[in-house]
Amino acid sequence: MKKWKIAVRIAAFLGCAALLLYGLTVFLKDKRVTFDYDTTRKVEGFYAEEKDSLDFVFVGSSQMFTSVVPAVLWEEYGITSYDFGANEQPMYLSYYYIKEALKYQDPKAIVLEVSYCNAPEYTHEGVHHINLDDLRMGPVKLEAIFDIIPEGERFPYIFELAKYHDTWTTMDKASFQYIGADKHNPYKGYTPSLDGFADGGEFNEEIAKVTEKAELAELSVKYMEKIIALCKEKNVDLLFLKTPNDHIQNQPEYNAVADIAATHDIPYLDLNREMKGQLHNHVFHAETITKRIGEWLTSLYEVEDKRENPEFAQWHEDADYYYRYAHQLRLNGIEIFEEYMAELIGKDYIVCIAVNQDAGAYLSEEAVALMQQLGCQWDVSTAGGNSYLAVVENGIIHAETGSEDVVAYENRIYDHTFKVVSQGSQAGCNASIIIDGVEYAPNEKGFNIVVYDPKLDMILSTNSFEITES
């Protein structure tokens, strides 16, 4: 009986120690959770997707997950997809990502982005940690570690606390908040980029003329062949994709991929031959790229349009996150007051307006009408140099007032404290819009506007417009 009790105590002790070790690892492990470096959200978000719910899984490097926007595939075609990849991912790591993906999803096809089709050797430790750390510990991850990582360097990949034991000294607020957060990723692995041209720039026709074919590195070919064999074994289609990057010097490599695709009867879309691109494509150009990919996929497969399927209602919510983010970029690129107002009408944002010096004696009739559609009731064009402020939300007025004197508003909305102050030409010439103690107003002459999105819980836009006599 004594031996039994001792065994139970030892087992309980070991169990508690294991739980403590796991908890410390989760707490201290490096968390890559903010744009443009959000591999942790990307990988853990994949595991949060409902099993066998994805039509397509995209695998590859940052050139893939900054160019393929799952929200656009959903919005345009009703296709469910996910960008399951990590920074600088070579073929030998893509192989293990595909192997891991097929444990959880049974897609119509794996879409392999081939930018890193010519890695001549195993890359450096940093890339290995970025790609391996966030995969779930299990047979696939262990196989990858023992296959890729040299003997003598594997310990911190298996027992991650050995590498990250002192990261508590450098953890930021986002990392702390992520520990207990829902791991669902509404962006479906996509990472927005603001690099390069919003329209992609001018297409380099010289790329389409390149016919040379490189001899790909043996290591890359080996793992591409393993990927092909794996997909055949799992009875899932494999597609090759090259997102546009305008790297004419690498086009012979992408041409060589075409030979591999032809040998194995694998559909291959090389967008370098169709459109301009960058290393990381701008959000708006990524939309164009994704629409082209959607055309390609729907030409190859009959895919159920799930937009009206109530079982996929969450996909509408998730896509909305992306389109709100994209709307932020569009707002911040607008320089005309009327266009800016028009973009805000009908949106469930909180719009804070504070006038500095001049309340809009030269406002056009169109501008006044747009402000009234937004929810403002005053005809601000008659206010001259008076102070004026407004706080409106999708047609609902939280506050609107004007005077020759200083006007101010303070209240809590959505658990945030909003404080708005306007001082017209007779009251000191100042504009202030403070949210949770942080000043966001540009405090320029004219209309100072701050837009808060309660769904994204973020400041969407800050802008100012001086209305002058035309």
Residue positions per predicted region:
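Secreted/periplasmic serine-hydrolase-like ester/acetyl group-modifying domain
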Residues: V127-K234, K306-H327
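C-terminal regions of proteins
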Residues: P252-Y323
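Short acidic-hydrophobic catalytic motif
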Residues: H327-S470
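Short hydrophobic beta-strand that contains or immediately precedes a catalytic carboxylate
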Residues: F56-G60, N281
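Membrane-embedded segments
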Residues: V59, Q63-I145
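Hydrophobic membrane-insertion alpha-helices, especially the h-region
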Residues: K5-V26
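Acidic-and-aromatic substrate-binding clefts and catalytic sites of carbohydrate-active enzymes
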Residues: E88-Y92, L216-E218, N245-P252, G360
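Alpha-helical transmembrane signal-anchor/signal-peptide segments
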Residues: L28-E49
